[in-house]
């Protein structure tokens, strides 16, 4: 039986993200759904997009972060993460780059929700300052 992909051009990005979360059906889907909720709580004006053949992307005056799923991690890549303060040390991947930073979430990890929302706020503020 052929596995169907949630990606179709006629569906909205939000519906495609819904489908991805459901399709995963494991801790990765639950984690991606939880992160999505936190992003929307932190920035009610966030725009959900679907890029690069199936990557959920959250934007506000530019890309805030992406939500990639792999076998062992959910990776949240912040497009301009290197320019963001991270006093809680959430960034734990892509630390050598000049622009991006990422948070790799493993199955038993707990995300500091308050610190994550602060990162979203900071990413929005940075994008807004660059949009002027």
Briefly describe each language-model feature range.
Residues 1-132:
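Charge-dense, helix-prone N-terminal extensions
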């Amino acid at each position: 039986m052929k596995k169907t992909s949630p990606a179709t051009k006629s569906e909205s990005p939000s519906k495609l993200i819904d489908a991805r979360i459901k399709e995963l059906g494991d801790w990765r889907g639950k984690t991606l759904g939880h992160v999505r909720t936190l992003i929307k709580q932190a920035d009610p004006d966030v725009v959900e997009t679907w890029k690069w053949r199936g990557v959920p992307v959250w934007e506000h005056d530019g890309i805030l972060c992406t939500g990639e799923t792999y076998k062992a991690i959910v990776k949240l890549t912040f497009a301009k993460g290197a320019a963001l303060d991270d006093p809680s040390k959430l960034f734990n991947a892509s630390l050598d780059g000049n622009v991006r930073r990422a948070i790799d979430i493993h199955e038993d990890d707990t995300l500091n929700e308050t610190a994550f929302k602060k990162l979203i706020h900071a990413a929005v503020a940075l994008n807004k300052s660059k949009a002027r």
